[in-house]
Amino acid sequence: MKLTFYGVRGSYPIARPDNVRYGGNSTCLFLRTDGGTELIMDGGSGVVNLGHEMMEREYGRGEGKSLILVGHTHWDHILGYPFFTPFYREGNSFTFVSAGQTGVSIQDILSGQHNDLHFPVPFENLAAKIDYQEFSIGETMTFGDARLGTFQLNHPGLTVAYRIEADGRSCVIITDTARIHASRLGDGMGGPEPDAAFAARYTEAVTAFCEGADLLVHDSHFIDHEIRDKEHRGHCTAEDAQKLAERAGNRSLAH
């Protein structure tokens, strides 16, 4: 498998000379297995450049097929979809894979971005074939030669980590998550107050989910001095990512 980062920033895209090395686009990753299964993880502004590259391949001929894994639907993770060129080419096929939520679907959320007050092209007018598949948290799925595991993260709303296994390798993608001992966030996670027993169970579970993966991709929105008094904002530090990678025995860490 090959994993490419097209966007690594959070909250909003940036364009500054001191950020050129890692780029300024918001979250988007692309994974392709040796067998040709293609997975897009989130549609921040980085998905725009990914789309341009895809149009140079079979997607430009209307022959492309990809899965789109939805980590969560905060705006910095979906704002690029209206500008994703392969959506506008008839014959292309995409399946949004997302956790089921009560009262709202991923189609509702994406269509909202295309409301004529925000964007001139209605979502239903996109030329590509777009399907949807919902899963329950903890469910494991198989798409082509890729096996996907799912885990709920500690972030406002419903946020999902994915474990992708293919070609004898594995990677875990944790985009947005917070220190569980400092706050409890997200649908069904309970109140915001820390709880030692819950934190211990969560830590054990997320470690097991990541255990033995060749690569862990993990949120590191803050550095240590920045996170003080901001633990409730749903993000971690590079040190937090390193500690999880050490507990889980991951071979490589990207943050």
Specify the residue positions occupied by each region the protein language model found.
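Metal-dependent phosphodiesterase/nuclease catalytic metal-binding core
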Residues: 28-33, 133-255
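Binuclear metal-dependent hydrolase catalytic cores
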Residues: 1-186
